[in-house]
Amino acid sequence: EMCIRDRTDKGFENVSSNHVKYNYAWKYNKEVIGDKAEKEASEDFLKNLGDVIKEYDTKLIMSGNNEIMNISDYLPRYTNKAVNFTGDDMGSDKATIMLFDYIVVVVIAFVFAVTTSNTISQEAGVIGTLRASGYKRSEIVRHYMVLPVAVTMVAAVVGNILGYTLLEKFFVNVYYNSYSLCTYTTLLNAEAFVDTTVVPIIIMFVVNLIVLEKKLRLSPLKFLRHELTNRKRKKLIKLSHKLPFMTRFRLRIMFQNIPNYLTLFLGILIAGALVVFSIMFEPLIDDYADVVKKSQICDYQYVLKSQAETDASGAEKYCVTSLDTTDEKYMTDDIMIYGIQDNSRYVDVDIKDDEIIVSNGVMVKYGLKKGDTFKLKDPYSDEEYEFTIAGSYKYDAALAVFMTRKNFIDTFDKADDYFTGYFTDKKLTDIDDKYVASIVTYEDLIKVSNQMKVSMGEMMYILKYFGIIMFVLLMYLLSKQIIEKNAQSISMTKILGFKNGEIGGLYIAATSIMVVISLVVSVPIVNAMLKWAFSSYLYTMMTGYIPYMVRRSCFVEMVILGIVCYAVVAVLQLVKISKIPKTDALKNVE
């Protein structure tokens, strides 16, 4: 931590000159754009500054003053993490939110498609009459398209208004709580408009159009007869008479509603993915800190400004630099290139002088395997490098490439005695602080995960509760569709003397069994879906790497949440069953 204090001139004179450092900031007369141009400009400036200081020091020495000046640190903008990290961090947040956004849109489109399909089933007689009266299929398609598309458009407009007004401060404060940011000006963002408004409307339009076109292909006569399928009626499955009557009745309900239960399963699958995605990140960040600890190279990783020797036992020299990735499918990543000693005590892997090993994160994120070529480039020049991967090394703290120190020196044309720092498990006390650029410890390695927890904390709560709400709504809507499609059968059972509780035991119990089965079966599928989403989308839209890890407790929570949600929904459906009149059984009877 840094503390700033004011002192009088007289008080400042009492401060030892050994502890005084003069800091200066500079700004280019002409704007420099791009890291490569900034590197060239900053090197020119440093060279000129060095010449000026050298000339000044010469004059001091000639005047008998030995307190000469030197440059102890130099930090241009393009290497300043305090300036660049916030933008990079927001970029990964954006990728996460966009993935969540598209999952939600798919869920909503699915709900509208199911609702529209159910509406067509209920109004089949009316549609058949209209078709027989001369109305074209395209006219009916337009009629049923209006509501879902109009609702989506209104919701998108209202969402944009809320995003730029009432909710603006909330999301701004998420980042103000994490970073020391300057004041901001709200600007309309075309990309955000496309992602949150145009894309959802297109998805909604296409999904509903496909459903309607498929449903309305039937002839008017079939609509009038309520025969809403081209498939021939299947023969009834024979059930053993040894089974109790209520069990056979319940099984018959399940067999008759297989298409509805498949729709319910698909809905639970999508909603389950939404819930797990919204609750997985907090434990994932904690688990990430644990795997970083386990794969940490050493307790203290010294990075030096200039070479300095140490007599400490156990200290091991290494080389390090960074290169950029070239694959245009992904955002540009900084890859740490380590040159390590032969038979290293800290990096326990056997590497030959003509090969390289990559961290497991590189393998997973870029979909690489042994024998593949990994292309990298110098971010400040046109020089490119091609490395053939000989294997992987478990190192989760960063995206890294490991090679022998000799190979590093040959590859980057360094002196034979060149090194960048030391790996060690204890502090080095015989190296002057002026030679030390930084010391990387476990606390430094997990700063990223801690920062993610702070910056994403409030956002994750929003995703979590929103995901749960969507789960409940989807469960309610889909189970409601099943009751409505069986309204005539339920009405008939009432005429036969069944009570509301008994009917609920038949229809709701059958659906409850299918809900539990769907929740359990969906667990491995949701896991595979999210893993695919990480590798195919999230990794391409963010810098850095965080492994895909989902605790089992997240899936257990999904199943329990689904059961609890359905228990609430079942009560509501029991009320709905009680309101179905017996007269429904007399309607639409062939």
For the regions a protein language model found, what residue spans apply to each?
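Short coil/turn motifs that cap or connect alpha-helices
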Residues: K136-R137, S219, K369, K499, ...
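Short helix-loop junctions at transmembrane helix boundaries
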Residues: G159-V194, V516-D584
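Short cytosolic juxtamembrane segments of multi-pass membrane proteins
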Residues: L216-K234, V575-E590
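Short, membrane-interfacial amphipathic segments enriched in basic
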Residues: K232-R248
